[in-house]
């Protein structure tokens, strides 16, 4: 079943709102315009932190649906755990939902079910292969973000590759998990160095996947023998008297 931990969700929102984590929130907000350049569509589904929802809203959308918590419903069949029809959304945005969802791969499969043939899927989350992932075992597991599920870029790419998606955008930021006030003035310089020497090892990842469309190619029939059209025998012709 698709379930989220309500406590983890709320604590992550509080974490982003803390003044000490301003730089991480800014990193995410700065990435949103870059992500939006790679997505376009009419029917958008937003799954994740409500803190960043309005950044993805647009008057061009015919529909915009946002959900934060994911739970199973008695009215939803076992094969359809999100209350949406197949092929119903062409833009899907996932902000940290993989991090606080108990079964992230099941969520990915559900996203694929409701995605149209030309859909784009955007994801933001915590990168397992980073300094954040390295220090996570040493941190307090009862506070955010250390009690969340971190995922590697490789695993996420493989999940979507198996389902038939191509990666159209990839980036990471927030190289250092803890930023003392004495270092805050150097954050921009550290970010530049991280882009050059450790582009895949930032604590936050930003990914966009496009669903592959497999066009139907018409096949020309080749006849090995000549196709003969025989005339009707005269006796079979209807004569008007």
Residue locations for each model-derived region?
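Class I SAM-dependent methyltransferase Rossmann-like catalytic core
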Residues: 1-37
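A short glycine-rich, Lys/Arg-flanked "PGG" loop and its adjoining helix->strand segment in the class I
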Residues: 105-120
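Conserved class I S-adenosyl-L-methionine
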Residues: 120-147
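A short acidic, Gly/Pro-enriched loop at the edge of an enzyme's catalytic core
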Residues: 80-92
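C-terminal lobe and adjacent flexible extensions of AdoMet/dcAdoMet transferase-like proteins
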Residues: 190-241
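Class I SAM-dependent methyltransferase SAM/SAH-binding core
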Residues: 30, 34-82
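Short alpha-helix
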Residues: 147-170
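Conserved catalytic loop of SAM-dependent methyltransferase domains
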Residues: 167-192, 200-202
